[in-house]
Amino acid sequence: VLLKGDSIVAVVDDAQLRDYAPKQTIRLPGKYLMPGLWDTHVHFGGGPELIDENKQLLPLYLAHGITTVRDCSGDLPDTVLAWRRQINAGQLEGPTIFTSGAKLEGIKPLWKGTIEVGTPQEVTRALDGLQAQQVDFVKITENTLKPELYLEALRQARERGMRTSGHIPVQLTLEQMADAGLGTIEHQSYLLRATTPREQELTDKVAAGTMTGKEAMRESLQSYDEPTARKAFSYLAARGTAIVPTLWGSRVTAYLDREDHTHDPALQYIGKGLRATYDWRVQRAAKDGPEAIAQRHAQFEQSAKLLPILQQQGVSIIAGTDAGFLNSFDYPGQALHDEIGLYVQYGLTPQQALQSAVINGPRFLGKLDRYGSVAAGKAADLLVLDANPLQ
């Protein structure tokens, strides 16, 4: 494998090596070479006072073999855009960053670092601004964003040729989101709604205000039907809507009642300020009674079991972790290894799990000409391994 600068020049057999005069030769007998890993759902944030702690996460990703991250919006969008530029220019050490910039939300949302939109005209202005920043995709969340404006944002983004990622509003079905052109669904638990024959009924009740989202989730779990799930996932695949599972972060939160993370070795790599942002989920989970805890467990397990069905129905599974601030004990770097380990545990093959972390991310972003394999013209983002990851 011949490298020049940040690119692979050629992949040749030994007999062809005499055509080249390398300045340096690295011999790796008995080792395995593969493309760098991608974590396609990370966050940087916690306020301006935590910029330095977030910046320290960049080499941590590299130390775990993660050469590319997709930033799904925190509350430091301008800082991340600057890092993207500096890393691309070779001025900052870190993984290649693809970012959404600030996410779209409704008026006065829970989340910080958002562009608040309340009218179609404001959606237009927001997308104008994001395009001017040359963001890599548009992130949309549903805390206070009106469902009709969510669909409007997807429509306008698709007209502009902008890729989209988002959460699923409780007032809309997955079919509606796929029809509107949503590129990736972030967090696999959202798919549970589409696994019941009662999806439309439950969605309508939530939209009418006669049922809460949590109640609808409980009803969805109780009325799970695999043929319905397969039909829904085939629909997503046909529309080109992918899934970023973020299973590891979901698992950590689901089992906070059973597992003590206060002595995790990975905590030593997380700054004190970022560690403090973990508290809110821990404190919220501590207030759950036995029934709520049981639902947390059931929701995670049922969600995770959908993974092989998604694969079988042709949905593109893109590895992402939700690592970063706020998401308790979901450690940048390590989390991706835990994530793809769960993919195998819940039914994917090692090869499929690796494809989710190497090939499917660049495919979503239209970057397979540069990433996803060890081949001429691709980025020289390479990992050297002691063992065969396919085994």
Language-model segments: residues:
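Histidine-rich, glycine-flanked metal-binding segment
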Residues: 1-34
